[in-house]
């Protein structure tokens, strides 16, 4: 359920035209209501900004491959990091080391695909894919 909470938080940010750019365990808080909340928007930016990133941003291991070059961060960048976070919550390691078996495997693989065009198109789409496998 935590990952779905984070999908909803990202969908809200993305609908406001904001990309987080630093999804990682340290930027997630579990509330007293046992919900996941996304923290630290210090390197967030507008999705529609014409400016390209001029330096690598994000956290090593969670940053999408495109964040290591000079490019524009976007929704797919956040979804990649959320896929890494999901994998880490399940296996304890980065998806490059191990990926869970079963139906979640496909979700992690799609979210962390190195080709942006193959990732989920939105956080809402990722939440829909996760919903059948999560107890809310």
Model-derived features: positions:
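Catalytic-loop of the protein kinase fold
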Residues: 14-30
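Conserved activation segment of eukaryotic-like protein kinases, specifically the C-terminal portion
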Residues: 53-66
